[in-house]
Amino acid sequence: FQMKILDLTVPAKQAFISTAGPAAVVKALNKLNRPEVEHTFDRLSPMYIERKHMKEGLRRLWKTYELDRCKIDCPSWSAAKIFGMKFPGEKSGGFGIRVPTSLDIGDEQSKAKQFMTTANYLVGIIETMRAILRVELDPVVRLTKLRAVLREVTAVVTKMAFKPELRQNEKDREKVRIFFLVPLLHYIVSKVLCEPVHDYMMNRKGFRVGNRWLGGGARKYAAAMGAWDEDRTFGCGDVGGKDTKFKASDISVLLASILRCYRMDGSDEAFITQVWMEWLVDNTAYHIVNWPGGFRFVVGLLFSGDYNTSFLNTMHVLWAIHSYGAWCHDVHGIDPVTTLRDGVPVLSVWVQGDDVTMSSCDDRFDIHSLNGYLKKWDLELKEDSVVKTKQFFADVDLVSGMIRTPPDQCIVFLKRVIYTDGHVVRPFRDIRDIGYRLYYTTTGVPDHAQYCAKLAGLMLDTMGTNEPGWRFCRAMIGNIIKQKRATLEGMVSAMEGDYFVKTRMYKQGLQDASAEAIWDLTNDKSMLLERVDGYYVTPEEEYLQKQSYDDRPMMGSKY
């Protein structure tokens, strides 16, 4: 991996040196043949994909310089084309991305030279990381040094932009988001790390999973990939109202290569993957949404709203499936690689940005065991589809409040925070860290009754299928009511006003029940409001328990 950017091809180098400008470089780079990666197990490791497609990611970044008419240090992802709007201060719309000061070589220099400086800086970072891996043998020292290197490229908010949702839904019509925009260097990092896997999941050589939200639309893409051909179906999704089928084997090889990292404790791939996960966590920030009646906080990435969001979200979903593999391996003694291979289908996945559809492909795992980890409180569990798979649909949204459970039920979905235990990466987020902040009244204050209603609906949905999640929901409601932040009556009133929770109440026969009756029916005498034995409590959680809600640190701190 001793790669220099200028050694792409002889024509590319000549074009760069010539006076023709960036257009000639783009033309030369466009002639590069896209490398074809064979669908073999070893050749799809994350590090192999990164090495193979570094040129491709940089080539696409080159192309953006020519397409966008922005300032020298503000390459854009054609936001005017994507969103049909212009941002304040931009000539033709687009995101204002500034190169970090240490990389800024002056406005008088050419776009090409500025880009090459940034790209070479990135290659230097990667080379430094690999040198650490070669020299340091102690795993803790390795990880410490890798984290120190990667900290140099921590994203900094340099600019914000506002964008209306442009939806027809009455509730969301006036919603406006604030987007956090990041330096060019972080675009390159995210493209190099995330785009190859994302691309393979979406539109490459049989990895027919997910849809491109740019360029053609879901129906066109589904038709192009043969989604409705009966002889090539396994698993099921939904595109344009039609059942869309795909092979579970299409994604199995890719997932298997990622799952390998779980058991590659001394490898370069495992350590770089761990550090990369921490980098994602370091760039997790609060997303501010301006609703008609006021503001509310949503947990999101600094990349929220730009072209790379889809890449990063896809990777988070992949890591959810990685956790599923760990669950298979540690708890049930099943090799997750074998589990996902042809002939032993267990789980098929459809990923599009932050939306995911999963199908249980046989009877080995109970589909209900996944309840309580998804944003939609009412899981739409359908009957056997035309391809004989039971499926459920779930929207993994940035506003979800996640339930943390013991490691033996570790299905971790989008926007879970990661922390390290020694050199082991583990998932962590206490729902109290963010949960009640997600539901605001029109006056801009937390609506604890609505939050309790969501928890109650989730508790009803998971009763008997996810005991740790059920206990935690009940404990949360009990604590909020004890603190007199909400009442049972207020919770039930909010439940009646929430479509999904109300649907769940009707299914439980609670539509006319009083608040006390609902509480009694959902209560098991063995389930106390206090902490119960067997619930996995981390030091971070113990720290958070000792603080009041208002004093608890916001996300983005080390907790």
Give the label of every model feature segment.
Residues F1-Y559:
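Viral RNA-dependent RNA polymerase
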